[in-house]
Structures are given as C-alpha cells and as structure tokens.
Amino acid sequence: MMTKLDPYFGEYGGMFVPQILMPALKQLEAAFVDAQNDPSFQAEFTDLLKNYAGRPTALTLTRNLSPNPLVKIYLKREDLLHGGAHKTNQVLGQALLAKRMGKKEIIAETGAGQHGVATALACALLGLKCKVYMGAKDVERQSPNVFRMRLMGAEVIPVTSGSATLKDACNEAMRDWSASYDKAHYLLGTAAGPHPFPTIVREFQRMIGEETKAQILEREGRLPDAVIACVGGGSNAIGMFADFIDEPSVKLIGVEPAGLGIDTPKHGAPLKHGKTGIFFGMKAPLMQDKEGQIEESYSISAGLDFPSVGPQHAHLAATGRATYESATDDEALAAFQLLARSEGIIPALESAHALAYAIKLAEAATEETLLVVNLSGRGDKDIFTVADILEKQQANNEESGNE
C-alpha cells in the first residue's frame, strides 16, 4: 500500500494492523501531511504552545548538581509546561489534527497518567469527548493524575487484562479505535505504534530540541557535547534528539529503565536486551521470552514501563547514531532526591533516569563537558511512591540497626 511518508526507519516501523484500521491510518497520514503544509494550522498550534502551554520552556544551568567542576549540566525544563510534562506538546498537535479531520471523540492510553492528563486538558480546551485507557496497576499508583483527568471531564477506564499496565492499556485503546475510527481519533501517547504515529509524534515534539539548540548556542556559544533523555516509548527523547541528529559532534544518549538490574527479569530495556518482533502495530525491539511471548517490563516509573520502543530509536541504535544506556530504580531514586536537595527541583521518576546517567557521565569526565538533560516532567505525581519507598528503606535500616 502506498504511503505519503516513509513508514520505516531502516528495518523498523511499518503498519502491522488489522486491515480494518488501514483506512484510518491513511486518513491520518494525509491529514497530517496536509496540516504540516498549512500555515494556518501551524499558526494555531504555535499559538497554543506559546499562550496556553507556556513555550518556550527554560534551559536551566544547574548550580549544585554537577559532581565535577569541569562539567556543566543544563536541564531542558519540560516540567514547567502546562500539564507538568512534555506530553502536552504533541497532544495539542494531535487534538488539533483530530478536529481538522472532523472527529468528535479522542481515545488515549496512559501509563504514568501524564499523557492522560495532557489528553484530558486538550479535549477540555478544544471541546472533544475524552476516553482514557489505563492499566489497573497504574490507576492505583497514579491516583492524583486519575483525579485530574476525571476533573477535566475524561472517562478513565481501568484495564485489568494481562499485566494491567501500559501495554495492556495500549491494546485496549487500539481495540476500541478499530470499532470507532469513523468518529474517534486514537491519540497515541508516544513515538511508537504503527505508521504514521512515530513520525507525527516526533514532529509535534521536535520543538524541544529546536529550542534547546537555540538556547544553548545563546548561553554557551556552542552545541552541547551530549543530550540525554529517558526512553520508554521514546517521545521526549526523539523530541530532544530530532534537531541534533544531523549534528555529529553532539552525542545522543537515551536512558532505559534497568529496574532491579539488567541481569534480572525486572527491567524495561528492550533496546539493549530485547529481540526484534511485531508489537503494537510496528516492527521494533521487544522484550520476549524464549517462546517469543511478550515479557512484562518493569520500572519504578510507570511511564517507562513499556516492553518495546519507538522504531526511530531502534534505527538510531542500529546505526550507532545514538547510544542507549540504562539506570536502575535505585539510581533514579538517588538522582530524584539529589536534584530536589541540590536545585530545589523535583523531577518525574522517568526524567530521574536520564539525570542519573548524566551524573555518572559527569563523574567520569576528565575535560570540560557540556551536558543537556531533558527534564521531561515534574515529580508531583511520584511523591507518594517515593515516600513509601523511603519509609520502607528507613524501617529496614532501623531493623538491621537493632539486630
């Protein structure tokens, strides 16, 4: 089937969906290409980003975070965006696109709840009906975001099938869309899934890297040595990387969740430890067992708890243009606390994975180095999770001290 845009990134990507969804994907691709070439669409999108969401976001030089005087660590402050994370960028773009296509209803999936909140706010703003699928486990661990979504008029549907996490919410959302695409738009939350979603999401997130490039040149007079972002599905990372891909002097570093350790079954690092397979409408690295069944991914952060990754990240890894590392729960937790104590900024646990790796890089540096970390979201949603963990750790320490 002919497409207007290339559905593949190297060998990854594609449109592996039931035939019934092909017309919906074709319609979406055509509408996207048309909108990208329409100055009035771009003007409305830019206006919403500026006057509703609060772009451009700040680029903050940390004062106390870097463990090495040779290393400057800047934070791209997507946590300051309306809605609390980078998710708002592309949600506004897709919601405008849905209205342009005459859709009345939005279907979405969410893990940490940030994409759900962003979708709910865009639907409230633009007068669209909103339905959000969320794994039952995530509904429990992200109750503040569930309340926010419902407050803004969204219907939140807990998904109890499978592992009751993000991948199951994705499956249910896709199932719903296949029965209702004539009136509904599936507002996918990450740079993954069938074509044209990975391309649409990248283009509606690329202002992260564009702003970063302009801001760092203004502040430092040069490009950074590396840009670092956490990777679940990969939307915040591809938004940061997109404008730097053609700058060979800039290292692109994605940080996957190592969970309890890469050598344990409890992690979410398909790029480093997955096998290529077909999942969620795309060909991409995937966490699979010996029989080829999809393994449950694991991370302390609900937003990184995804067993696959966007196809462009897979291609960037395969070609060597980007490198993908990992950070454990404990490392992310330490970085979460360190940023709060050293800079007065509470990051999302997702973003804390990228911070953890940046701190490692800084410790090892032997020459002047300029790092930019994409602080993809704020940590309000995670404070109860972190409080519980720290309380348990303290209780364990006290117990071992009494033995």
Curated annotation (Swiss-Prot):
InterPro entries for this protein: Trp_synth_b_CS, Trp_synth_beta, Trp_synth_beta/beta-like, TrpB-like_PALP, TrpB-like_PALP_sf
Pathway as given in its UniProt record: Amino-acid biosynthesis; L-tryptophan biosynthesis; L-tryptophan from chorismate: step 5/5
E.C. no: 4.2.1.20
Modification sites for N6-(pyridoxal phosphate)lysine: 87
Assigned protein family: Belongs to the TrpB family.
Cross-referenced HAMAP family: Trp_synth_beta
PANTHER family in UniProt: TRYPTOPHAN SYNTHASE, TRYPTOPHAN SYNTHASE-RELATED
Protein's UniProt name: Tryptophan synthase beta chain
Species of origin: Shewanella loihica (strain ATCC BAA-1088 / PV-4)
Lineage: Bacteria, Pseudomonadati, Pseudomonadota, Gammaproteobacteria, Alteromonadales
Gene designation per UniProt: trpB
